[in-house]
Design a protein with these regions (language model features):
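Non-catalytic, mobile gating and regulatory segments of ester bond hydrolases
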Residues: 1-101, 105-204
């Protein structure tokens, strides 16, 4: 994993666009490469969506023959408000590489974006990382679903509480690889930007 600290810092300072359903995203283009950023919780509505974790079945993509799965309702709602904006960009044939970055709430949305692009633009060189990202999948995933999330990394600092939510007891689990960094100083403190920066600096 390269440049994690710089990705984290840029994710927190970049200017975001906001949809009418409280989705927050930013797009950075450098030639044939796109970097997509997704913002942490930034208001009351984001927190409401965070706690709307009753699972809903995902809507199949066009030409999908298998691979429907159950998703956190709040995150699915936010992603669906962003999806049309992302679709307009990633279907440009000149785009050959996409990097996706999110923190906290934005890390959940980043996972859904990654899965969407993996299915709809399988020709693209794709990478993704979610710092302190919560779980998005409910139940068990089939082989084709797992394949669409393969390659995305959830970065967990210490024992960051948010990366353990929603709880396994409610049927949620991480479908993406979880990469651990840093030492724990407390469930809540481990989620703070300060602790992530410190842990990522130590990784470099």
């Amino acid at each position: 994993m390269k440049d994690l600290l710089s990705k984290f810092n840029e994710c927190r300072r970049i200017a975001y666009l906001h949809t009418d359903k409280d989705g927050s995203f930013a797009v950075k283009r450098e030639g044939e490469k796109l970097t997509l950023f997704f913002e942490e919780s930034n208001g009351r509505n984001d927190w409401i969506n965070n706690f709307r974790f009753l699972a809903v079945p995902t809507k199949p993509y066009k030409n999908m023959t298998e691979g429907v799965w159950f998703c956190h309702r709040g995150f699915d709602k936010v992603w669906k408000s962003i999806e049309p904006y992302i679709a307009k960009i990633i279907y440009e044939t000149s785009i050959t590489k996409v990097d996706i970055v999110g923190y906290s709430h934005g890390g959940a949305i980043a996972q859904l974006c990654y899965e969407y692009i993996k299915f709809n633009r399988p020709d693209i060189e794709l990478s993704g990382v979610g710092f302190g990202a919560p779980r998005v999948l409910w139940g068990f995933a089939g082989k084709s679903v797992k394949e669409r999330f393969k390659g995305f990394k959830v970065i967990r600092n210490g024992n960051d509480l948010v990366t353990h939510l929603p709880p396994v007891i409610f049927g949620f689990r991480h479908i993406c690889e979880v990469v651990k960094v840093g030492k724990s100083v407390g469930l809540i403190q481990d989620h703070t930007p300060k602790r992530y920066r410190k842990a990522l600096q130590e990784e470099e």
